[in-house]
Swiss-Prot record:
Homohexamer. This is RNA-binding protein Hfq. It comes from the Bacteria. Pfam families: Hfq. Belongs to the Hfq family. Residues 70-88 have a biased composition (Low complexity). GO terms for molecular function: RNA binding. GO terms for cellular component: cytosol. Residues 9-68 form the Sm domain. Residues 63-102 are annotated as: Disordered.
Amino acid sequence: MAKGQSLQDPFVNALRRERVPVSIYLVNGIKLQGQIESFDQFVILLKNTVSQMVYKHAISTVVPSRPVSHHSNNAGGGASNNYHHGSNAQGSTAQQDSEETE
């Protein structure tokens, strides 16, 4: 189980540490927005006007409002080349959405 969290924990912790605004999409399609205040193995505490405890099993996607460096102790930085965040990823999603509506 620790192997599976080697990407998740540093990513979520970087979002928390840098107070990056995030959009969290749940599996039922609901979009939540705020800043990650805290997290553990099972939940994320999301703060906006109120604090919400969101169970990780209900989360589909976490989208940061800006790129985040989430690799820890990676001198080569190779892991960051495999993951792209920001306008390019969002642009391709918008393009896919427009193609579906045509």
